[in-house]
């Protein structure tokens, strides 16, 4: 499938804020890794009869928890305390758009998971590629560079699981039809994701929107399937 999941780039103002407030960024990133593992486990509990899904997401959950350990260790190395932060708006806005009846609920859960992983991949890339001296502390930038490929794999895994579900649930008879169905629904959810990730936001989080005034430019895709190509976990 030739999909372009993200409909708007991360605002430059968010990147600047992330550099300025990197201790808070790390704290929320640690929370995000735990939430990602929790999401995978929730899907395993919701659909235990789907053996491929449970096997794949079991591995993904373990990897997300290893990432949490890496972030937590880095925070300790940097002398940063653990911060309790209330959730941002990003995930809740995506959840509000998901359908509640099967087989569409499962499809939307998988596609929203793909979008979140794609946004994480994009932000890791942006932060890791900043010039030395103008970006994050070197250990933080190095960790984000290392994590980018994992987020790409997770994005692709969620998409593959969604495509398989579309066929097995009878939403599409052939793979090409499943791809078209997924592309349509992914594009719909991507508009909501882009608004949450780019519109003015009063809180700073790993997936928050622009911290300054201004309207987001939601339009052409900015991150394509080829940018996220990587081996499956």
Map each language-model feature to its residues.
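Non-heme di-metal
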Residues: 1-233
């Amino acid at each position: 499938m030739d999909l372009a999941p993200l409909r708007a780039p991360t605002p430059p103002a968010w990147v600047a804020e992330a550099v300025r407030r990197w201790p808070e960024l790390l704290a929320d990133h640690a929370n995000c890794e735990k939430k990602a593992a929790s999401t995978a486990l929730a899907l395993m509990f919701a659909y235990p009869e789907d053996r491929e899904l449970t096997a794949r997401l079991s591995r993904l959950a373990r990897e997300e928890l290893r990432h949490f350990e890496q972030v937590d260790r880095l925070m300790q190395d940097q002398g940063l305390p653990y911060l309790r932060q209330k959730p941002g708006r990003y995930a809740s806005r995506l959840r509000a758009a998901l359908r509640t009846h099967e087989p569409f609920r499962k499809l939307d859960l998988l596609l929203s998971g793909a979008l979140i992983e794609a946004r994480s991949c994009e932000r890791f890339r942006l932060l890791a590629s900043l010039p030395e001296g103008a970006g994050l502390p070197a250990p933080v930038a190095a960790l984000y560079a290392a994590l980018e490929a994992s987020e790409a794999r997770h994005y692709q895994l969620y998409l593959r699981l969604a495509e398989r579900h579309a066929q097995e649930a009878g939403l599409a008879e052939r793979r090409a039809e499943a791809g078209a169905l997924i592309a349509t629904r992914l594009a719909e959810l991507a508009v909501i994701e882009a608004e949450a990730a780019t519109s003015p936001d009063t809180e700073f989080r790993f997936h928050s929107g622009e911290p300054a005034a201004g309207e987001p430019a939601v339009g052409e895709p900015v991150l394509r399937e080829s940018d996220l190509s990587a081996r499956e976990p």
